[in-house]
């Protein structure tokens, strides 16, 4: 879920608000639906995964049983290529390496800037500055860095309850 915190910032939504949770829910549902539809398309080309059984896969009480009716219909008709589709992996280093340091994981960044220490192959360490992507973009666009807008919040500035509410908003997807 790399970048959710920064995406909400760039949409002008404060992370710990009902509006941000609604947008995160919308994003999560979209990602889920597109992942399942892509797997159906792959099943059309290559067949369903070997142990696929539509009745068991779509039976009540499991994740796939909560999919929209039109997606379940496509799965029943064509099968699904991937037995597992969605997971949220740890994304701290991944966001730095591949996402230009967009907020890592589901939460907003823990800091707008920090120093990262990297061990080199020769055993020495190199320190370098890291800036959050949304913060850096705001600065580049001429934003007032002395007074960030209220939707710029770090993970440390929001309550544990707000973290929990965001997880609850996206967990069904």
Q: What role is predicted for each listed range?
A:
Residues 1-12, 172-173:
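Core structural elements
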């Amino acid at each position: 879920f790399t970048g959710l915190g920064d995406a909400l910032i760039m949409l002008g939504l404060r992370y710990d608000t009902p509006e941000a949770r609604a947008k995160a829910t919308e994003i999560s549902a979209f990602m889920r639906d597109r992942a399942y539809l892509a797997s159906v398309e792959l099943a059309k080309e290559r067949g369903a995964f070997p142990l696929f059984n539509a009745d068991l896969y779509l039976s009540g009480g499991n994740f796939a049983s909560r999919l929209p009716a039109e997606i379940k219909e496509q799965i029943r008709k064509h099968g699904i290529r991937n037995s597992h589709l969605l997971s949220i992996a740890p994304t701290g280093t991944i966001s730095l390496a591949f996402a230009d340091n967009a907020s890592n994981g589901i939460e907003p960044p823990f800091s707008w800037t920090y120093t990262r220490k990297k061990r080199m192959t020769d055993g020495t360490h190199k320190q370098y500055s890291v800036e959050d992507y949304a913060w850096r973009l705001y600065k580049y666009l001429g934003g007032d860095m002395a007074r960030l807008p209220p939707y710029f919040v770090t993970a440390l500035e929001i309550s544990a309850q707000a973290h929990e509410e965001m997880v609850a908003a996206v967990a069904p997807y």
